[in-house]
Design a protein with these regions (language model features):
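Acidic/His- and Gly-rich active-site-bordering loop/insert found
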Residues: 1-90, 102, 106-114
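General beta-strand structural signal in soluble alpha/beta enzymes
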Residues: 44-46, 120-122, 150-152, 312, ...
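Metal-dependent amide/peptide-bond hydrolase catalytic core
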Residues: 38, 202-383
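Non-cysteine beta-strand/loop elements that form the S-adenosyl-L-methionine
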Residues: 63-65, 74, 177, 334-340
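Divalent metal-coordination and catalytic microenvironments
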Residues: 15, 64, 94, 120, ...
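Histidine/acidic-residue-rich, glycine-tolerant segments that coordinate divalent metal ions
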Residues: 49, 71-73, 79-89, 95-96, ...
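Alpha-helical transmembrane segments that form the membrane-embedded catalytic/substrate-binding core
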Residues: 97-101
């Protein structure tokens, strides 16, 4: 490996100190573009950053993707490289994802021991499910036609460097819902005069819990979570309006649409019974992420050849990934690398104490570089 572990660490810590939210990754993009240009790559900038590296005469092209955005979370860890921006931190490891892909770009630019073209894709705003679509809207795939596309994500609680993937469904979809209730507010001592939306909202919330347990098949893997319940009431004021928000995860479109149908039916029925108005919105930004068979087999072979511990038929993940918008168009594979089982790197994703495990950086670089050499072998080299 041509890039040192210390250089990888420094690069990752620099990203960690200066996190930027989705579609605000201005300085992050500047750093990435400068790094790639310094290594001799052609760089195209738009909503994201794309690096192009060619070697040999083969026209085959593959894409490797990393996400760039941070989260609106106040970091509680006290590392020397902790976030310098109040209320913003890299709590999902995108600092590490960027670093590993940049490390692979340097490694491959130095060796050029492959035949074809590699497109290094640095994507904004993964956390809100909008970044991949924004790059597709800029005609990423027509400008850079690819035969395969890949992405990785770190996974705390799993042995460092342990690789997990599977053919078919790898990540659930995510749908966000809002239920707006409008009744008649009033004095807390005279509930019969008004139409209280808190009691109606509570009844709706309880009924929603029956969708997964009673209406979908056991083992569906779907999750419905109510995450917010807001009203305009006060200590002695019954609310006239309430807002219920939540999150749905599904493993297939059929279940997702059935949850949406039942939610609308429950809200309409309970609201009508209590003579209040209601409105439901149900929006899906993250669709299910599906891994293609051939690309997944290639990732598994790379893990075998590198001597990594791996599981090539892991359980589908309940979280969501907007890499799905790429892999729905180009055959692809998302795989996971363990971030550590204890100590450094084991805290959950999206927690204020989370930190990417620096020991994973060289492993990720090796996986990316080996994947390129496997898919784009030089003449005379074993594929």
């Amino acid at each position: 490996m041509t890039i040192s572990i210390e250089t990888l660490r420094e690069l990752r810590h620099e990203f960690h100190r200066f996190p930027e939210l989705g579609f605000q990754e201005k300085q992050t993009k500047i750093k990435i573009a400068s790094f790639l240009k310094a290594k001799g790559l052609e760089v195209v900038e738009g909503v994201g950053v794309v690096g192009i590296l060619k070697s040999g005469k083969d026209t085959k092209t593959i894409g490797l993707r990393a996400d760039m955005d941070a989260l609106p979370i106040q970091e509680t860890s006290k590392h020397p490289y902790s976030s310098t921006y109040p209320g913003v931190m890299h709590a999902c490891g995108h600092d590490g994802h960027m670093t590993m892909l940049l490390g692979a770009a340097e490694e491959l630019a130095h060796s050029l021991d492959f035949d074809g073209t590699v497109i290094f894709i640095f994507q904004p705003n993964e956390e809100n499910g909008l970044g991949a679509k924004a790059m597709l809207d800029e005609d990423l795939l027509s400008k850079f036609p690819m035969s395969d596309i890949f992405a990785l994500h770190n996974l705390p609680g799993i042995e460092t460097g342990h690789l997990l993937t599977r053919k078919g469904l790898i990540c659930s979809s995510e749908s966000l819902f809002e239920i707006r209730l409008k009744g008649q507010g009033g004095h807390a001592s005279m509930p019969h005069v008004g139409r209280d939306t808190i009691s109606v909202g509570s009844e709706i919330i309880q009924s929603l819990q029956n969708i997964i347990s009673k209406r979908l098949p056991p083992g569906s893997g779907s999750v419905l979570s109510v995450t917010e319940f807001i009203s305009d009431g006060a200590r002695n004021v019954l609310p006239g309006t309430s807002l219920i928000k939540g999150d749905v995860r599904s493993r297939n479109e059929e279940d997702r649409l059935e949850i949406k149908r039942l939610m609308n039916k429950i809200v309409e029925g309970i609201s009508r019974a209590h003579e209040i108005d209601s409105h439901v919105s149900f929006e899906t930004e993250f669709v299910e992420t599906i891994n293609s068979a051939d690309q997944t087999e290639t990732v598994i072979k790379v893990a075998e050849e590198l001597g990594l511990n791996f599981n090539g038929n892991c359980e589908p993940m309940s979280f969501s990934e907007d890499f799905a918008h790429f892999s729905n168009v180009v055959p692809g594979c998302l795989f996971l690398l363990g971030n550590g089982q204890s100590g450094h790197g084991s805290d959950p994703l999206h927690s204020s104490s989370y930190d990417f495990n620096d020991n994973l950086l060289p492993i990720g670089v090796k996986v990316w570089s080996s994947l390129v050499r496997k898919l784009l072998p030089k003449s005379g080299m074993q594929a």
